[in-house]
């Protein structure tokens, strides 16, 4: 399953090629979009990108955990966590891609 990792620079290059902005403007656009998404998540807002995914922040209460080495009980403090839920559209695209690669003799 491993493969290439998509980076900010890759996104900026894709915007440059597809939209026609300069490389600098493309990089600034990618940064602005990612910054807005990050700020919304930090504020506790749900970010829903249709046909892609939903990012949601939720609170977790304090609970008792266990140190796997010693077996000792330890408190896990309350915290906020982000969840990522892919859309059905994205899930189906991944499934189709996997099925197509298997049909072509891939893994």
UniProtKB/Swiss-Prot annotation:
Q: Does the keyword Transcription regulation apply?
A: yes
* InterPro entries tied to this protein: Hist_DNA-bd, Histone-like_DNA-bd_CS, IHF-like_DNA-bd_dom_sf, IHF_alpha
Which GO biological process annotations does it have?
DNA recombination; positive regulation of metabolic process; regulation of DNA-templated transcription; regulation of translation
Superkingdom field: Bacteria
Function in brief: This protein is one of the two subunits of integration host factor, a specific DNA-binding protein that functions in genetic recombination as well as in transcriptional and translational control.
Say which family it is in: Belongs to the bacterial histone-like protein family.
Protein name listed in UniProt: Integration host factor subunit alpha
- Give the source species: Mesorhizobium japonicum (strain LMG 29417 / CECT 9101 / MAFF 303099)
- The organism's taxonomic lineage, starting at the top: Bacteria, Pseudomonadati, Pseudomonadota, Alphaproteobacteria, Hyphomicrobiales
Which gene name does the record give?
Answer: ihfA
């Amino acid at each position: 399953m491993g493969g290439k990792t998509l980076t900010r620079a890759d996104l900026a290059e894709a915007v440059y090629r597809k939209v026609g902005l300069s490389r600098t403007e493309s990089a600034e656009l990618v940064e602005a979009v990612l910054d807005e998404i990050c700020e919304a998540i930090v504020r506790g807002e749900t970010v829903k990108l249709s046909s892609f995914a939903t990012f949601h922040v939720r609170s977790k209460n304090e609970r008792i955990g266990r140190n796997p080495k010693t077996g000792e009980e330890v408190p896990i403090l309350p915290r906020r966590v982000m969840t990522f839920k892919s859309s059905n559209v994205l899930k189906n695209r991944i499934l189709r891609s996997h099925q197509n690669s298997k049909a072509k003799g891939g893994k």
